[in-house]
Amino acid sequence: MALIKHVKGVHPKFGDDCYLAENATVVGDVVMGDQCSIWFNAVVRGDVNSIRMGNKVNVQDGAVLHCTYQKTKVVIGNNVSIGHNALVHG
């Protein structure tokens, strides 16, 4: 089962029909649309700001999504694929 953690009482929210690999990590202020997938060893860290994903977003193996404290959020549109081991930093 994926590691899903809250930060300061804020829990990740998932749309319908999402897939999380067994060792994926999703933390904090993260909102995912429908039919998203987070693959093996990927990390989506909404611990210091928010991360928003549209529908049908594919975060491939080893990718990391993070944001900057009190500066920039991460916003991903619909039908986006984030490649293996990519770093997306707001």
What are these regions (language model features)?
Residues M1-A2, Q70-T72:
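Acidic/polar low-complexity surface segments
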